[in-house]
Structures are given as structure tokens and as C-alpha cells.
């Protein structure tokens, strides 16, 4: 199976408004706190109390804002 490819904004495409908007949600902010150790994490580790569909939504918002990088290999990001 071919890994899924995601769009990640370049530095020029990023905007402060989008980054701050992505971080304004308490759930996404907690996800970033968990990522702050600098290690790679399985996406399901980021918010273990959320349904997968909700978690996918939040990881997409963070990725599209340029806050996180998602690798389409399993669920690690």
C-alpha cells in the first residue's frame, strides 16, 4: 500500500492567524504539549479520549496551519 501524501505549507504559505487559530483550541493545544518532547508519536497517543474522526480533524487543522508534520505511514506524526 502506498503511503498517503499530505500537503504541508511552506514557510511562505504559513500565516500567524492560522497558526494561532490552530493553537486556540484546548484539545489541539494539549496535543502540541504531548508533542513538545520532540519525539515522533502515533496520532492516537495525542488525545486518547477522542474518537478517531475527531482526532483526524484536529491533526488536519494543525498540519494545514504548519504546526505539525504528518507522515502517511501508519499513524505516526
Give the predicted meaning of each segment.
Residues 59-60:
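Short, hydrophobic-biased segments on the C-terminal half of alpha helices
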Residues 2-20:
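Short, Lys/Arg-enriched N-terminal segment that forms or immediately precedes the first helix
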Residues 64-74:
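Beta-hairpin "wing" of winged helix-turn-helix
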Residues 14-54, 73-77:
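N-terminal helix-turn-helix DNA-binding core of bacterial DNA-binding proteins
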Residues 31, 63-64:
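A ubiquitous, low-specificity "background" feature that marks scattered single residues
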Amino acid at each position: 500500500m502506498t503511503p498517503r501524501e499530505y500537503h504541508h505549507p511552506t514557510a511562505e504559505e504559513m500565516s500567524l492567524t492560522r497558526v494561532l487559530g490552530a493553537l486556540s483550541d484546548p484539545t489541539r493545544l494539549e496535543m502540541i504539549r504531548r508533542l513538545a518532547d520532540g519525539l515522533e508519536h502515533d496520532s492516537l497517543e495525542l488525545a486518547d479520549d477522542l474518537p478517531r474522526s475527531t482526532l483526524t480533524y484536529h491533526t488536519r487543522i494543525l498540519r494545514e496551519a504548519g504546526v505539525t508534520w504528518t507522515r502517511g505511514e501508519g499513524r505516526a506524526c
